[in-house]
From Swiss-Prot:
Its main location: membrane. It is a multi-pass membrane protein. It comes from Gloeothece citriformis (strain PCC 7424) (Cyanothece sp. (strain PCC 7424)). Keywords: Cell inner membrane, Cell membrane, Ion transport, Manganese, Membrane, Transmembrane, Transmembrane helix, Transport. Belongs to the MntP (TC 9.B.29) family. Pfam families: Mntp. InterPro entries: Mntp/YtaF, Put_MntP. It comes from the Bacteria. The keyword Kinase does not apply. It is found in: Cell inner membrane. This is Putative manganese efflux pump MntP. Probably functions as a manganese efflux pump.
């Protein structure tokens, strides 16, 4: 697979993670470099590892995995999005709000947004080319976009301020719905 094709694949796979990093940026009150790095590393690493896992599984499990991967992504993103919306409407302590820096939350979001990368890895297993190059490029592009996305999201969160978590929750649910509909055969473009 040539580098240009892999770059476009990487950008496509990174799009959902970028959108989620924007949402994460909305929720961070005091942005610091280490917070953006943590989010970007989670997404970049998962996006880099999942194609390798998919490639390793190869054609043997393609039909099995593709029959339910979209439901997992939809469920995880809808759950977290719904939780964000619910928590933004509560008048509870701030520490109970959506925390995009929590390792459990980050892992869940990273898995949900990298399921397409797993499927892409299965597809890559039938092509000639370097899986190492593909995984590296996918990981670095996702890392870069997510790092920038956290800062952009934070900036918009500062500007819009009130109830931005509702917007973030809706974005996550929409991403999950998009993944589900695309895998069910609906074209959204």
């Amino acid at each position: 697979m040539e580098i240009l094709t892999t770059t476009f694949l990487s950008l496509g796979l990174a799009a959902d993670a970028f959108a989620v990093s924007l949402t994460s940026g909305f929720s961070i009150k005091h942005i610091k470099l280490n917070k953006a790095l943590k989010i970007a590393l989670f997404f970049g690493c998962f996006q880099a590892i999942m194609p390798f896992i998919g490639w390793s599984a190869g054609l043997t499990f393609r039909d099995f995995i593709s029959s339910f991967d979209h439901w997992i992504a939809f469920g995880l993103l809808s759950y977290i999005g719904g939780k964000m919306i619910y928590e933004s409407m509560e008048e509870e302590k701030e520490d109970k709000k959506f925390n995009p820096l929590d390792s459990y939350t980050l892992t869940t979001l990273a898995i949900a947004t990298s399921i397409d990368a797993l499927a892409a890895g299965i597809g890559l297993s039938v092509l000639k080319g370097s899986i190492l190059l593909a995984c590296t490029l996918i990981g670095f592009i996702t890392f870069g976009l997510c790092f920038i996305g956290v800062f952009i999201g934070h900036r918009f969160g500062d500007i819009l301020n009130q109830k931005i978590e509702i917007v973030g929750g809706v974005v996550l649910i929409l991403i999950g719905t998009k993944i589900l509909l695309e895998h069910l055969g609906f074209s959204l473009v």
